[in-house]
Amino acid sequence: MAGLLSTFDTFSSRRSESINKSGGGAIIPGQRSTVSVFILGPSVTDDADKLLIATTFLAHSLDTDKQHSQRGGFLVSLLAMAIRSPELYLTTNGVNADVKYVIYNIERDPKRTKTDGFIVKTRDMEYERTTEWLFGPMINKNPLFQGQRENADLEALLQTYGYPACLGAIIVQVWIVLVKAITSSAGLRKGFFNRLEAFRQDGTVKSALVFTGDTVEGIGAVMRSQQSLVSLMVETLVTMNTSRSDLTTLEKNIQIVGNYIRDAGLASFMNTIKYGVETKMAALTLSNLRPDINKLRSLVDIYLSKGARAPFICILRDPVHGEFAPGNYPALWSYAMGVAVVQNKAMQQYVTGRTYLDMEMFLLGQAVAKDADSKISSALEEELNVTDTAKERLRHHLTNLSGGDGAYHKPTGGGAIEVAIDHTDITFGAEDTADRDNKNWTNNSNERWSNHSINNHTITISGAEQLEEETNDEDITDIENKIARRLADKKQRLSQANNKQDANSDADYENDDDATAAAGIGGI
């Protein structure tokens, strides 16, 4: 039997390994786009010219009349301006199955009177039409920088701070956009300005060079559609030699932003490991957590097998990134979130009210995290030679710090779980009402969560115990069964009503039933 059980324990990881293992089958070639990338030639030496070209690249990348692939090419051109050897950079990091980069040089010709004296060329020929297209008159639909609304003079900034600082401010902001562009597009603008604040405070990004919200959204749209651009940026982080002692300020800032990009989209996975497993509490021995623990173990193996690119599997849209979603290990994730909201106040703002939240495990996580004995590590206890008296005093302090009120945190965010708990259309039957009254439950489910609480979104320990008892021991009052029963009753009434009412009445009933079904299904 032991051998059989061990086989099942390793099945999840072996299954994932077999799915992701190369079978040596046919390769499906994609259609590669040809994208123009422009780099500065040796004749472009004036800092004002360089900054003008940088803002020109940025403006073209936001031009909605151009194809996204070429808009991405302009962002690549902008990023390459900070590289000492752009050709080598693109050859090393820009190899991609989706695009082929064609490199053009921008040179300064003193004899030219138009296009600001610039000419686009290669070794063999000059490209007059491309030059006109690149440097010709262009209408900016929106300002690039917030400072442009105040008529800030970029040349004055250039004279004050220098070209490297101005270019660095622009490029760092492009990198900051990547933090949220792929994994949280809805929160892109807010997330961008939150991350930017640290760079504004330390003077890296001057106020006159801060992107407008429209600029941020435009760059984010290009990143979402051009995986080749994202791959180039990720390869830059992977291959950047951070052990050098002569890192430039821009390289250091890119690495700082890279810390936000690493593991983007994997917060649930990382938090489950941190709060659910690494806390090593006794609840991990529960049999209903075992399947999720095995699943998490297989995901750890997959993550480690990706090597240096593992932190970027969501950004790169690796085919396996969907496996890391918390819906694939809901019980363990729910337990971990319960532990998290107790141990880390910042996690109380984390969206836990999701459709797959296991309420029982969420409350269990909070309960064990509040327990003083669960907070003491037996391994460290032996290593540090902690005395019984010291342990007892520690338990006493932990009990006092927890407040003693036994308040439980309510799931935050996520309309589905909120509707399931607070939906007023779900009523109690006569037998349920009597049973509830015997337990001194209130009629309003909101009051059950908030009564006698000292914090927002909390319930009392007695209410939690009653909820746990109701969920585990009394099927007739189980939350899921109550919702399912109400839905069944509504459907039965709808069926009977169809024989007596006209089509308009039927439509009203259907709308009411759909709304109730959505609330019930979303909550459980």
UniProtKB/Swiss-Prot annotation:
Which taxonomic lineage does the organism of this UniProt entry have? Viruses, Riboviria, Orthornavirae, Negarnaviricota, Haploviricotina
Show the segment(s) annotated as Ntail: 405-524
Assign the protein's first listed, main location to one coarse class: virion
Annotated region described as Interaction with the phosphoprotein, given as residue ranges: 462-471
Family membership? Belongs to the paramyxoviruses nucleocapsid family.
**A single GO molecular function, which one?**
RNA binding
Name where it's found.
Answer: Virion; Host cytoplasm
Q: What are the Acidic residues biased-composition ranges?
A: 505-515
**Keyword list, A-Z:** Capsid protein, Helical capsid protein, Host cytoplasm, Ribonucleoprotein, RNA-binding, Viral nucleoprotein, Virion
Protein name per Swiss-Prot or TrEMBL: Nucleoprotein
Q: Which organism is it from?
A: Human parainfluenza 1 virus (strain Washington/1957) (HPIV-1)
- Give the residue ranges for region: Ncore: 1-404
